[in-house]
Each structure stands twice: as structure tokens, then as C-alpha cells.
Amino acid sequence: MDLQLKGKKALVSGSTAGIGLAIATTLASEGAAVIIAGRGNEKLQRARESIQSASGNKVDVVAVAADLATAEGGETMINAVADIDILVNNLGIYEAKSFFDLQDSDWMSVFLINVMSGIRLARHYMRGMLERNFGRIIFISSESGIMTPPEMIHYGLTKSAQLAVARGLAELTRGTNVTVNSVLPGPTRSEGVVDFLQSMASKPDPTPEEAEKEFFQKHRSSSLLQRLIDPREVANLTAFIASPLSSATNGAALRAEGGLIRSIY
């Protein structure tokens, strides 16, 4: 299937590893010109080369050194790239921490990174999309936005907030060819996740396989997949939603969580 992304310009935040890198790679493979961002120049350039190679060197991949978790970094990106067709807000952090140990600074930090980074970019780029009557904005939320994990309540709050923002922005696109949607991955095999699962294991020094099995048995027992999701599985859905072919999908929260959420709506 041709996703009709050739000639489209896509910005993916949090794109030097994991889900973001997979999304950027998939979009580039479909012919989109891709913009990525990161704080560390070496890692940023490695990601750029990887994406460029995967596309067969057929598309432009622009790497902008900017910390999109900050307002200053957002301005750097906007100054470097004035207009885009597709915005994928993927930047995010997570940490397992008891509710009773969470300080005000913990709540604010995760909110500023997970929520405000996407709001800043959408606030700028959505204007141009509406003026040109085409655009796609996608928030990479999480199943945690619906099923708040007790070990990461602050994280769950930010993912619920993303769903609210995305739906609210979709309401502003009425009668246009601009859409705003959310994608909800489940636990995904990305950078740092294996260490995270091992840190939650009941016995010391478990193998990655043991930690993964225990995590799904104890903490995500409702998952039908019963394994970590591959980032490319999330990227495939995201690429379709970024495509002109998805024009009837707007204001939706689309799941790629392996059947973890036990509801049909």
C-alpha cells in the first residue's frame, strides 16, 4: 500500500531511539522528509544516518540539536523548521515511583516534558496546517492514559492529559483536512525498558526474559500479547494515521497495546 507520504514533511520528537526512531524510520521509508531532534549531537547524527540508510538515501533527514523538553528548545526547532505537514509528539519520560515518595518537582518535571513539549509544537505548527488545509498531529500517549499504573501515577496523569489535548485540538479542525489523533502503545521494547522491568522484578539480577515474563504476569496480566511490543509495530499504525489515507480518522485514541485494556471502546 502506498501511504502517499512522498513530499510530506514530518517532525518526530523523541526520535533518536525506541518508538520515535522507529516512527521516523518508517515515515522516511514511505517517502516523507523527516526532521528529528535530540540533545546529544553524536546520538542525533547516528539516528539521522540510520534513518537515511533505511530510506535508501532517497529522502532528506534533517537533524536539529534541540532539547524539546524546554521552551527554548521548542523555539530552536521552530526557528530551524518553520512549517511541516506531520507532527508526531513522541517525547516522553517515565519512572516507577511510589505515590508517597513523589515530590512536587517530580509531577512538574514529567508534565513539562510529556505534555508541554507537544503543546508548544502543536501551538505553532497547527496554524500553518489549518491555513494550508492539510496536516496530521499525532500524540504518542500510552495505555497508561486509560489504565493508570499504581507504580507510575504521575506518568499516567500525563498520558491522560495528552488524550485530552489531542481530542480538544481535533475539535479545532472541524471541516478541514487536518486531523489530530493519539496512539496508545502498551509496554514497548525500547531503550531503558528492559532495565526498568528488571528493576521491578521480585528477585535480584533476573535475566531480561525472566523480568519480562514476571512483569506481564504480575503487573500487566490483562495483556493478550503477553510480551513487549516491537517499536515497529507502533510505527506501522502511526505511519497510517500520518497518511492522507487516514482522512476519516480524527479525534481518535488508537490502541497498539496488545489487548491490555479490557474494554471495546
What are these regions (language model features)?
Residues 98-99, 106-111, 219:
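Substrate-binding pocket helix/loop in short-chain dehydrogenase/reductase
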Residues 174, 179, 249-251:
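Short, small/polar-rich loop/turn modules that mediate ligand/substrate recognition or access, typified
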Residues 122, 158, 166:
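Active-site helix of classical SDR
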Residues 127, 171-172, 247:
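Alpha-helical segment proximal to the catalytic Tyr-Lys
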Residues 147, 238-239, 245, 250-265:
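Short C-terminal tail/terminal secondary-structure segment
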Residues 9, 16-17:
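Conserved glycine-rich cofactor-binding loop
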Residues 142:
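Residue(s) in the substrate-gating loop at a strand-loop-helix junction
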